[in-house]
UniProtKB/Swiss-Prot annotation:
UniProt name for this protein: Olfactory receptor 6K6
Disulfide linkage: C125-C217
Cross-referenced Pfam families: 7tm_4
GO cellular component: a single term: plasma membrane
PANTHER family given in the database record: G-PROTEIN COUPLED RECEPTOR, OLFACTORY RECEPTOR
Keywords annotated in UniProt: Cell membrane, Disulfide bond, G-protein coupled receptor, Glycoprotein, Membrane, Olfaction, Receptor, Sensory transduction, Transducer, Transmembrane, Transmembrane helix
Keyword Membrane included in the entry's annotation: yes
GO terms for biological process, alphabetical: detection of chemical stimulus involved in sensory perception of smell
Glycosylation (residues): N33
Family the UniProt entry places it in: Belongs to the G-protein coupled receptor 1 family.
Topological domains annotated Extracellular: 1-53, 104-127, 189-224, 286-298
Intervals, Cytoplasmic compartment: 75-82, 149-167, 245-264, 320-343
Purpose of the protein: Odorant receptor.
Species of provenance: Homo sapiens (Human)
């Protein structure tokens, strides 16, 4: 009976010890696998022979237009003395940000469309996320500064020249960059410390917080917290700009001169269109929380978010802007004359 009880105890020990050792081995294996994740794979891109080239050419043309249009806007404002005002200073900053903003994602998209290697290193992914969101937040801050500029110009025109001096414009721009590049830094630093396990496939066309965090060995509530932080940032900027424009519209409607109505509305219409375009695409992209879409619509929303505002901003600011059209015409006329003189 004693021998039987001892054997039974050994059997009990083994039944308790074996699962414990298995769990420890599983954790060690998982830990080893986590350290092996050195790159992420983009799973949303088609192969080159399955339609990748079909998407490559339109995206390349769109990227070329974004670079050319925003670069022309930036150069025209810098060289045109008549455009050296706070309004056009912020437009030139916005154009420069659009160039940098699209360059963080579109070149990698183009590479993935024609290459069989659709991967990005972990460090490269973190850098892409950092610059993409930093530039996006900076752009929203610049749009806020532009709304404040229009608010002062229309609601307090007599004090406008003494308030919106070049020094203040530079300070607002530097402050926008400071906020943009500082706010995202803690999140990127936190993500860089997370262990990644299991699949390394990112179900998106660029590195973004939610797709990357879904691959980490962490609780999903962290993803919800990050989403809530981003939503608060977006809503705060939106409210500041929206309230400014509501006040502007009230003041414009109170003007007695029809000419004053037309001039004020034409001045603010372009900025209001850019504001709605930017925050509309941001809202569709980030204020959906747990809502899910099909692969097609998810990709379409991401592409639209990346290219929509940068593509239309040069068109909006130059289409009905007399000063901008005249400045662009003078620039090209000067280039044409310089070319003839060179010949």
């Amino acid at each position: 009976m004693k021998q039987y009880s001892v054997g039974n105890q050994h059997s009990n020990y083994r039944s308790l010890l074996f699962p414990f050792l298995c769990s420890q081995m599983t954790q060690l294996t998982a830990s080893g696998n986590q350290t092996m994740v050195t790159e992420f794979l983009f799973s949303m891109f088609p192969h080159a022979h399955r339609g990748g080239l079909l998407f490559f050419i339109p995206l390349l043309l769109i990227y070329g237009f974004i670079l050319t249009g925003n670069l022309i806007m930036f150069i025209v404002i810098q060289v045109g003395m008549a455009l050296h005002t706070p309004l056009y200073f912020f437009i030139s900053v916005l154009s420069f940000l659009e160039i940098c903003y699209t360059t963080t994602t579109i070149p990698k998209m183009l590479s993935c469309l024609i290459s069989e290697q659709k991967s990005i290193s972990v460090a490269g992914c973190l850098l892409q996320m950092y610059f993409f969101h930093s530039l996006g937040i900076t752009e929203s801050c610049v749009l806020t500064a532009m709304a404040i500029d229009r608010y002062i110009a229309i609601c307090n025109p007599l004090r406008y020249p003494t308030i919106m001096i070049p020094k203040l414009c530079i300070q607002l721009t530097v402050g926008s960059c400071f906020c943009g590049f500082l706010l995202v830094l803690p999140e990127i630093a936190w993500i860089s410390t997370l262990p990644f396990c299991g699949s390394n496939q990112i179900h998106q066309i660029f590195c973004d917080f939610t797709p990357v965090l879904s691959l980490a060995c962490t609780d999903t509530f962290l993803v919800v917290i990050v989403d809530a932080i981003h939503a608060a940032e977006i809503v705060a900027s939106f409210l500041v700009i929206a309230l400014s424009y509501i006040r502007i519209i009230i003041v414009i409607l109170g003007m007695h001169s029809a000419e004053g109505h037309h001039k004020a509305f034409s001045t603010c219409a372009a900025h209001l269109a850019v504001f709605l375009l930017f925050f509309g695409s941001v809202a569709v992209m980030y204020l959906r929380f747990s809502a899910t879409y099909s692969v097609f619509w998810d990709t379409a929303i991401a592409v639209t978010f990346v290219i929509l505002a940068p593509f239309f901003n040069p068109i909006i600011y130059s289409l009905k802007n007399k000063d901008m059209k005249e400045a662009i015409g003078r620039l090209f006329h000067y280039q044409k004359r310089a070319g003839w003189a060179g010949k």
